[in-house]
Amino acid sequence: MLALLYIPAALAEITGCFSFWAWIRLHKSPLWLLPGIASLLLFAWLLTFSPAENAGKAYAVYGGIYIIMSLLWSWKVEATPPDHWDLIGAAFCLVGAAIILWMPRSL
């Protein structure tokens, strides 16, 4: 269920941020910012539905998913596949996100 929230949130954030990248770094039209801003608003709204107990933890857990989605974006949209170090680093981040989300708080 969590993937149904965090994956669309990541796509919305990456799309929104990429619109600024495209405008500034790739010299695209400033009109790219209009859907980009809408995407960033969607991202912020989606994260408010996180099951985490507070915003900071929601963002921390989301960060692991964001890293995976960013690597997929780089691969599929920008034609730059991840190398083994990218994948190892992403795996560590997912483990960290899982610990933050699911480990008992009584320790």
Curated annotation (Swiss-Prot):
Keyword Membrane attributed: yes
Organism of derivation: Zymomonas mobilis subsp. mobilis (strain ATCC 31821 / ZM4 / CP4)
Assigned protein family: Belongs to the UPF0060 family.
Bilayer-crossing regions: 4-24, 29-49, 55-75, 84-104
One Pfam short name: UPF0060
Name the UniProt record assigns to this protein: UPF0060 membrane protein ZMO1566
A GO term from the CC aspect: plasma membrane
Record flagged with keyword Transmembrane helix: yes
